[in-house]
């Protein structure tokens, strides 16, 4: 995964660098 761009489409980076769904 390319963390520079973010995460899987539909997810966003959190402050701790993980990904969470935005839905």
UniProtKB/Swiss-Prot annotation:
Disulfide bonds: 7-19
Highest taxon in the source lineage: Eukaryota
Organism: Spodoptera eridania (Southern armyworm)
Pfam annotation, one family: GBP_PSP
Listed name of the protein: Cardioactive peptide CAP23
Stated role: Has excitatory effects on a semi-isolated heart from larval Manduca sexta, causing an inotropic effect at low concentrations of peptide and chronotropic and inotropic effects at high doses.
Lineage of source species: Eukaryota, Metazoa, Ecdysozoa, Arthropoda, Hexapoda
InterPro entries, A to Z: GBP_PSP
Keyword Disulfide bond: yes
């Amino acid at each position: 995964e390319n963390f520079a761009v973010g995460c899987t489409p539909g997810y966003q980076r959190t402050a701790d660098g993980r990904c969470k769904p935005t839905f």
